[in-house]
Structures are given as C-alpha cells and as structure tokens.
Amino acid sequence: MKHYVAVDIGASSGRLILGKLVNEKLQLEEIHRFKNGFTYRDGHERWEIDQLMQEIFIGLEKVKQLGISECVLGIDTWGVDYVLIGASGEKLADPISYRDKRTLNAVQNLTSEYPREYIYKKTGIQFMELNTLYQLYVEERNLLERAEKILLIPDYIGYVLTGVKVAETTNSSTTQMLNLREQLFDKDLLSHLNIDVEKFAPLTDAGTYLGKVKAEWLEEYDIPNCDVVTVATHDTASAVVGTPAEGENWAFLSSGTWSLIGMELIAPINNEAAFKENYTNEWGAYGTYRFLKNIMGLWIVQEIARMDDYKHSFAEMAEEASNYPYFKQIINVNDARFNNPENMVDEIKLYCQETGQTVPETIGELTNCVYGSLALYYALELEKMTEITGKKIEKLYIVGGGSNVAMLNQLTAKLAGIEVFAGPSEATAIGNLVVQMINQGEIESMRAGRKIIRNSFEIGEFSCGDVRFEEIKERFTKVLEFN
C-alpha cells in the first residue's frame, strides 16, 4: 500500500496530512500542524521560510516514526509570494508577504503606464495589489538583477527538497503574468518590468513528477525516501480538486483566511463584463479554469479574536453572534481598509460610524456583522457569476476551514437561494493527495477522485429559505455610497 503526504501550508497555519486509499475510500491522518505568519524584519513583513522548511522536516520525521520508509509527497501553499534565487542556488532574502504595504498604489501606478484592459485581455486575472506582477514592479532592482530565478513559495519548497526548479501552472497563473491564450509567461508584460522571462523556471502542469528528495536531507534528517509530485500547488486549486462536486451548474467557495468563490470552467472568460467585475481566470488542474472572485474571508474574524486576546474560541464567537439580529450592521468586507489594519475591531467600528450605522460593541455583535456581511457578499457574487457566464448555479460547495461555520453556511444558503453543501474542511490537502494518486495510477481522474471524496467524508447540507435579500442588498448599496 502506498503512503501519500500532503504538505499544505496556508497563510496562518500549515499541516502534513498522511493519506492512503483503502477500499475506494480516502483515509487521512494529521501528522503535524504548525503556525505560520509573517514578522516585520528588514523593513518589510516577511515569511519565516526557513522555519517552514524545518516544520516540514519535523513532520516527515514523524511520518518515518510510524514505520513508513517510502512515500509520495505533494506541496501546496498560498499564492503570489515568491523567493529570489541567486546564481549559486541560494535564497537572496526571506520572501515578503503579500500583506506588506509596499504595493500600495502599485496597481494604479503600473496601469497608468500600461492600460488595465490590455493587461486583463492578456492575462484574464483580476487586479489586486498583492499580485506578483505588482510585487515585482516595486521589488528592489539590485535583488532582481542578482536573481537567477524567481520561484513561487511551493515551487521553492519543492526546489529545496529535490533540487529541481519548476513553475507550476495553477499557481503561476495567479501572478498576473501568464498569457491566457499562449499559456506562457508574457514577454511583453515582463519586458515592461525589465525582467527577463528566463528568470522563471519552466512551466509545469499539476500532476507532473518532480523528483526524489535529495540524499543530503535523508542523511541530515530521519525522514522517508519520498517521490515528490508537483500537485496543484496553489491552495485554492487543490481545494477545488478536493471539492465533492457532482453534476453541472455548481459553484465552489474555498473558505479560509480568504474566500474564493467561483466556477470550474473548461474555457476562460475575459470579456468586458468579466473585466468590469474584476473576475479572474486562474488555471486549474487538468485543463480547467477557476473563474472566481477573491473576497476577504475569515481573516477579519481571526483578527477580531486576536484583538480580544483569544479569550473566546471561534465556536464561542459564533454562538455569541447568534444572539443578535442579522444584518443590523453591514460592512464591505473587500474594502482595502480591512486588509491589514492595526486594530481590526476599531476599524470595523469606525467603518460603521462613518457609514451611518449603529456601532457594534460586543464580540458577538462584531462577529455577527462579519458573518452576515460575508454571506451577503457571497450571494451578490453568485448573482454576478450567473450573469457573466450565462450558467444557472443550483448548488454551492463550501470547502476549507469556513465550511465548519454553520451560521455562515446557513446565511449563505438563505441569501443565495440555493442548496449549500459544506465540507470537507481539509479539501486542500485532499485535493493535493488526489493529484498525487492520479499521478501514481491509483485514481483514474479528477471526476473519479471527487466520487471517492463524496464516499469518504461527511458533507453538511443547508437548505435555502426566505430572507429579505433585495432589502438587504439595497441597504448594502446605500452603505457603499458613503465610501
């Protein structure tokens, strides 16, 4: 029996999940979990990338302690951030987080030189200041000139483990530097940044064999001899693979630190309507596209908890929230002011004050405000998606950590007026494992993998119901007018 390890690292935590296929059912075991985050160093918010590597080795040592001497391994992480590699293969600096303030106004500055419509027609990717395109636009020239290669975070981890440099496509597409039609890094865009296309590794599809873990790591650490497979390395791409969807006319919501809501399509949509609504066409696994919108997610609730010194669990916060009427206060969760404020609680209160609403005071009111606002945003985006794609959405599959928040799932079902299916919460790791198993011939296809997922995990169901959607939508429109 083959053993598979998913290295799944998000913006706030990481984990190593051991998986195996037994009687057409996936069995999972969490081997190691660790915190992730950025710290302010050398003038920027930076990821502790060396510490992440140590956590991976700790997890792999735990796998070996289970008596597993060989395994298959795949890596997925958050997107857009990168590591600059020098001529000798060394890391030139710790990677800067997408939440760093260095890209403020970068979209405006670059698009004043290079029209938005032109960039969108080329890439089909939404405009966000965190995109790699704008990070590289403001990167130190000295570092860029010294860099031989630019590797996104999961590709860097794969490189450290195996010595092989690649640019996996699902994650590379989020950079806003891939040409949608040519399916290559866009030389024209890169030349505008004065970056040679050769600084990027060869594009590689999800499901491609990468290589064996280097012998030096087997000597330094007591870890299994692993074959590394390049999975869908963008965590959302893996989460979509791990979505237990069936049939047609469904949408997905990967709910975690970020909310990514969209549809899986076989062809991109980069027309005027998609451009106007800032929709993105990220590449998916096995020739698909993730037509989606990036929305702020549980980050806001996580920050409320942090400001409260974690006195309440997230379950307790949701319970407190249920004691208050929904939609008493509504915030625009995608307002840039909620991206990384010094104090999230104060920012929410100030927003409500500025928009003529009552100010939430308790932890329950604040949580209620955020969950209600997120559900409203989801429903509005599903409406827009239907208009742009011409496809009727009948079901929404919520996966990731947010699938455990029953209140948010139920509010979304009511506002959107469609059935909502929630779970599995570890869809990203599951999608990572499924791609590995397809590579190894244990699962036939992504469709077959999704059937196995449905048979392996409990999926929650939330029915739609009557709610004053149009009235709430009108109130939200008035709130936006204050901005």
Curated annotation (Swiss-Prot):
GO molecular function: ATP binding; glycerol kinase activity; rhamnulokinase activity
Segments crossing the lipid bilayer: none
Listed pathway(s): Carbohydrate degradation; L-rhamnose degradation; glycerone phosphate from L-rhamnose: step 2/3
Residue numbers binding substrate: 79, 234-236, 294
SUPFAM superfamilies named in the record: Actin-like ATPase domain
Reported cofactor(s): Mg(2+)
CDD domains given in the database record: ASKHA_NBD_FGGY_RhaB-like
Enzyme class: transferase
Catalytic activity: L-rhamnulose + ATP = L-rhamnulose 1-phosphate + ADP + H(+)
GO biological process: glycerol metabolic process; rhamnose catabolic process
Signal peptide: none
Any one GO CC term of the record: cytosol
InterPro entries linked to this entry: ATPase_NBD, FGGY_C, FGGY_N, Rhamnulokinase
Gene3D superfamilies registered for this protein in UniProt: 3.30.420.40
Disulfide bridges in this chain: 352-369
Domain of life: Bacteria
Keywords recorded for this protein, A-Z: ATP-binding, Disulfide bond, Kinase, Magnesium, Nucleotide-binding, Rhamnose metabolism, Transferase
Enzyme Commission numbers on file: 2.7.1.5
Residues involved in ATP binding: 11-15, 257, 302, 401
Active site: 235
Entry similarity comment: Belongs to the rhamnulokinase family.
Alphabetized PANTHER family for the sequence: L-RHAMNULOKINASE, SUGAR KINASE
Function: Involved in the catabolism of L-rhamnose (6-deoxy-L-mannose). Catalyzes the transfer of the gamma-phosphate group from ATP to the 1-hydroxyl group of L-rhamnulose to yield L-rhamnulose 1-phosphate.
Name of the molecule in the record: Rhamnulokinase
Species in which this protein is naturally found: Listeria innocua serovar 6a (strain ATCC BAA-680 / CLIP 11262)
Top-level taxonomy: Bacteria, Bacillati, Bacillota, Bacilli, Bacillales
